[in-house]
Swiss-Prot record:
One of its GO terms (cellular component) is cytoplasm. It catalyses: cytidine(1402) in 16S rRNA + S-adenosyl-L-methionine = N(4)-methylcytidine(1402) in 16S rRNA + S-adenosyl-L-homocysteine + H(+). The keyword Methyltransferase applies. This is Ribosomal RNA small subunit methyltransferase H. Specifically methylates the N4 position of cytidine in position 1402 (C1402) of 16S rRNA. One of its GO terms (biological process) is rRNA base methylation. The keyword S-adenosyl-L-methionine applies.
Amino acid sequence: MTTQASTGLRHQTVLRDEAIDALLWRDDGIYIDGTFGRGGHSRLILERLGPGGRLIAFDKDPAAITEAGTVEDARFAIEHDSFAHLDAALDARGIGRVAGVLLDLGISSPQIDEGARGFSFRMDGPLDMRMDTTRGITAAQWLAEADERDIARVIRDYGEERFAVQIAKAIVARRRESGTRGPLDRTSELAALVAQAVKTREKGQDPATRTFQALRIHVNQELADLETGLKSAFERLEQGGRLVVISFHSLEDRIVKRFMQALARPEQSAAPEMRRAPLRAHELPAPQLRLLGRVRPSEAEVSANPRSRSAIMRVAERC
């Protein structure tokens, strides 16, 4: 996503040129930017598109929609929605196939750096965490109602946090004190609560990192949206069309990798009995995607933008 080290510094789009180089294989196609953010990728796509090209961008964040309103280009359109609803949006516009889809996953620095959004454990703010602040329940609302086992499951599965059970117990214990202390609805209090529950520290990582990631993913249904969005993106790609996905943690990258490999190497994902049977060449499942590689940020980019360090970009082409 677009990153910004602190208020007032210019936005830095991760793998900006690499992503667009991989995505744009013809300049007159219809392209999708599934996560507009602050528009870093979209603006570069528009710079490189020919007069016959089109770009449709998606974002759930109202702030991103406001930013998209500053793009004055007849070839551009923005959808205030998740890229998971790609099919419906394209159908409404009478569009069948597209030349490429870019998904830049995760959270942007402007979202993290604004305490009022509730994503940051370093700044106090309401425990919100919604990408789309116009709908859905907040992290505070979910924590106030969820079963202790569900809280532990979310923190374990989406945060890969080994102290998930202890953190869930601490949250539920604090919830019992709501009558005298008020609800658990501030990021600073949750961060302090997690720090007390986590028994060991990882070097260079705040103890609340994994819990905040897990709650954000759950509140926004990020992994479910990713799985749905990948399927829709593939189905909409024309022959030769490109799918470019930038992920920032192992849960996202694992989903992307498995999805692409299943379509590029269908014989490996076939049923065990089919893999064991001797098949003629024409009986083998045909690949539907061609893997074009994996890219990491350069040392120079990581030095200039440390938050890009974990980024992995995977590229595939429809056969």
